[in-house]
Amino acid sequence: MSKKIKVGIVGATGYTGVELLRLLAAHPDVEVAAVTSRSEAGTAVADYFPSLRGVYGLAFQTPDEAGLEQCDIVFFATPNGIAMKDAPRLIEQGVRVIDLSADFRIRDIPTWEHWYGMTHAAPDLVSQAVYGLSELNREAVAQARLVANPGCYPTCVSLPLVPLLRQCRLKPGMPLIADCKSGVSGAGRKGNVGSLLCEVGDNFKAYGIAGHRHLPEIRQTIAGLQDGIAEGFVFTPHLAPMIRGMHATVYLHLSDGICPETILRDYYRDSLFVDILPAGSTPETRSVRGANLCRISIQQAAQSDVWVVLSVIDNLVKGAAGQAVQNMNIMFGLKETHGLGAIPLLP
């Protein structure tokens, strides 16, 4: 590509923001032209993130000063409630937008307002947003002006289910249970007692049992693919004593006489970022650390009609910034692997 794509990042001081900067630094077709932060305006990116010394010469600017309207695409790596106020103006000016927050993920406005506790500022734009689960909506993402990047739990849970749901292979009326674990970085970079080392180290706990914001997002995907399944979906997230990584164990009931591994392999045969492991394998979170990968295995529980799906991602990469870059590549007709060739870190 002769002319590089001009990229802006709004809210670049959080974990997803620095992941975007890390990934885009290795992208051959983009130029990061603007990075914003109200609290760190004037601070050099390399001073704020020592890992980026010698990589970026930019300084953070306020959104009003950054010239975002001159970018080809803008990523919003902001808390919920920001993109829905600021993205409409950019879209009107011809800028394409990928929102990493939850502002445009839920199509039913009352449902979104219930779970996120605020009035939606751009309800008319929600119907125009494409849900950016890349392997499900690739064609729609390619044409999108606004992509709602999925949440980390929804990505980890949905990717192994999509091929089975598309063929209506789950048994209606039976429970579908997702037991998930996340690294602490999923809580973001803000100060929080629950994220302190003394709280999470040598500890393991469930949270959000009465209702997690990602529940309606996952149910929306399920309901859009197969009837009679979403109502029986149960989701329990856990906080694991690790920095990054996500593991989902999904228990499901399938139609008789099928080979689910074959269905998964056939669906993801040409997908570069989904790895279907051999039967009996148990994917590990460290096998995807730092990479835009989802590794999946499926096997039947012993002496049971229950199937067990295991799925792992890096919550900051395939669960956030990596999938956002993948969606950008699709939107601009680039190779999906550009900027996403990192091999997982081990140990």
Swiss-Prot record:
Pathway: Amino-acid biosynthesis; L-arginine biosynthesis; N(2)-acetyl-L-ornithine from L-glutamate: step 3/4. Keywords: Amino-acid biosynthesis, Arginine biosynthesis, Cytoplasm, NADP, Oxidoreductase. The keyword NADP applies. It catalyses: N-acetyl-L-glutamate 5-semialdehyde + phosphate + NADP(+) = N-acetyl-L-glutamyl 5-phosphate + NADPH + H(+). Disulfide bonds: none annotated. GO terms for biological process: L-arginine biosynthetic process. The active site is at 152. It is found in: Cytoplasm. Pfam families: Semialdhyde_dh, Semialdhyde_dhC_1. CDD domains: AGPR_1_C (cd23934), AGPR_1_N (cd17895). It comes from the Bacteria. The keyword Metal-binding does not apply. Its EC number is 1.2.1.38. GO terms for cellular component: cytoplasm. One of its GO terms (molecular function) is NAD binding. PANTHER family: N-ACETYL-GAMMA-GLUTAMYL-PHOSPHATE REDUCTASE, CHLOROPLASTIC-RELATED (PTHR32338:SF10), N-ACETYL-GAMMA-GLUTAMYL-PHOSPHATE REDUCTASE, CHLOROPLASTIC-RELATED-RELATED (PTHR32338). Belongs to the NAGSA dehydrogenase family. Type 1 subfamily. Catalyzes the NADPH-dependent reduction of N-acetyl-5-glutamyl phosphate to yield N-acetyl-L-glutamate 5-semialdehyde. This is N-acetyl-gamma-glutamyl-phosphate reductase. The lineage of its organism: Bacteria, Pseudomonadati, Pseudomonadota, Betaproteobacteria, Neisseriales.
